[in-house]
C-alpha cells in the first residue's frame, strides 16, 4: 500500500513539528518602561500627596 500524496505531506509536517517541540523562540527584550503615562502620573500623585499630608499633619 502506498501512501497518498496528502498523507505523506501531513506526516512530514508532523515530523518537523515534533523536532521543534520544547524549543522556545527568543523574545525581544523591550527597552523602556511599559506603563501608561496616566498610571504613572496617578502613582506620583498618590506618593507626593501622601508625603505632603504626613508633613502637614506632623506640624
UniProtKB/Swiss-Prot annotation:
GO cellular component: endoplasmic reticulum; endoplasmic reticulum membrane
Biased composition (Basic and acidic residues): 16-30
Pfam families associated with the record: RAMP4 (PF06624)
Region annotation Disordered: where it falls in the sequence: 1-30
InterPro entries: ER_stress-assoc
GO biological process: endoplasmic reticulum unfolded protein response; protein transport
Localization of this protein: Membrane; Endoplasmic reticulum membrane
Sorted UniProt keywords: Endoplasmic reticulum, Membrane, Protein transport, Translocation, Transmembrane, Transmembrane helix, Transport
Topological region Extracellular: 56-59
Residue intervals on the Cytoplasmic side: 1-34
Metal-binding as UniProt keyword: no
Transmembrane segments: 35-55
Membrane topology type: Single-pass type IV membrane protein; Single-pass membrane protein
Family to which the UniProt record says this protein belongs: Belongs to the RAMP4 family.
Summary of the function given for this chain in its UniProt record: May interact with target proteins during translocation into the lumen of the endoplasmic reticulum. May protect unfolded target proteins against degradation and facilitate correct glycosylation.
PANTHER family named among the record's database cross-references: GEO09675P1, STRESS ASSOCIATED ENDOPLASMIC RETICULUM PROTEIN SERP1/RAMP4
Protein known as: Probable stress-associated endoplasmic reticulum protein
Amino acid at each position: 500500500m502506498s501512501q497518498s500524496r496528502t498523507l505523506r505531506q501531513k506526516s512530514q509536517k508532523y515530523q518537523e513539528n515534533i523536532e521543534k517541540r520544547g524549543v522556545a523562540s527568543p523574545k525581544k527584550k523591550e527597552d523602556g518602561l511599559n506603563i501608561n503615562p496616566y498610571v504613572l502620573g496617578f502613582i506620583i500623585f498618590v506618593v507626593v500627596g501622601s508625603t505632603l499630608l504626613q508633613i502637614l499633619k506632623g506640624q
